[in-house]
Amino acid sequence: MRFLTFIIFSFIFFSIIHSQDSKKISEKYFPDFDIEVPTPAFNKKKGFTKYSEMMNFLNELCEKYPNKVSYKYIGKSQKDKQIPIVYLGENKVDNFKVCFMGGLHGNEPASTESLLLLIHNLLEVDSLKDLTSKLNIAIIPMANIDGYEKQSRYASNGQDLNRDHTKLTNQETIAIKQSISDFSPDLMVDFHEYKPYRVDFVNFGEYGTTSMYDCMFLYSGNLNVCPRIKSIVENTYLPPAKLKLDNKGLRYHNYLSSKHKNNKIYFNLGSVSPRSSATSFALGNSISMLMEIRGVGLNRTSFKRRIYTSYLLAYSFLNTSVGNSNHIKSTLEDCNKFPEEITIKYKKEKSNYNLDM
């Protein structure tokens, strides 16, 4: 009986971890957008853009627009693949600087595809071209190449690169941190995808439940981050981004995660850990965010929807940066004086919270 129970539980666990939206769910709640995505992934019926395809894609754009886009290699992956960072803009000294990153977790393909779409459109679409004259933009479209090539969250040594921003034990993380530090962005956004089906949700409702949010916003609550950085995120960047999402019928929420403890499920809002990018770059005095798009485990289900969600957010952040550059820069200068004291211990608060699923 125990063995049978274990088999049943294992089957449920495996099904939840690897489940995708049914056709009925995706068509009703997460329909794809009818948009053109000119990235290599859409030249084939399955799979995602491979590293070699991405480099061909970037090389074609660099040949076509030699004065508007370039890239350089910032280091190598553990399997000896060169990691590119793409630069767009006129590189004016006084321009506001924006850095975007995707593919730090290799099984989150919409992050890379959306940034390739953004690079393409910044060069090809008239309504976006003006942004590159007002901003200096750096984009790392595929940060974890080895993981991405096999659609694994982890680097080839099994480590999570988004838990390595303090110890810097992986060569990819060292290269990424150094290149972003050299660029010194005013705004840093790391694009990810999250898993909508979780074991924690199995007992919710009659058939279990899934997360309904197309995207979640993560920005640091670390007490050593200048509070005005958090204020800029909440009051300057997110309102216009939410408006763009509302206009497309996309759902959003601040980032939350769940865990089991004492036979109860607890939800955590936000994050404070300097091991991950959102807090790490905020501690470096950049406006820092991490975008979580609903997508891990969905393969190419609602893929254009996921890509377009990331793309809309990136586009919104660029426009907001142009319109508020002086205010944001002066805020970051003021934040150089913070903190006078360093917090080394904190305690989480527990509170009642209504969550739609």
Q: What do the predicted segments below correspond to?
A:
Residues 1-22:
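Bacterial Sec-dependent N-terminal signal peptides
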Residues 18-39, 204-218, 284-290:
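Short, compositionally biased low-complexity segments
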Residues 21-82:
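Short glycine- and acidic-rich boundary segments immediately preceding or forming the N-terminal edge
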Residues 61-64, 121, 179, 244, ...:
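Generic, well-ordered alpha-helical scaffold segments in large soluble proteins
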Residues 71, 85, 139, 188, ...:
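Conserved beta-strand scaffold positions in the cores of enzyme catalytic domains, especially
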Residues 78-104:
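Acidic/His- and Gly-rich active-site-bordering loop/insert found
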Residues 94-104, 109-267, 272:
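Active-site/substrate-binding loop(s) of hydrolase catalytic cores
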Residues 257-357:
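Hard-cation-handling environments
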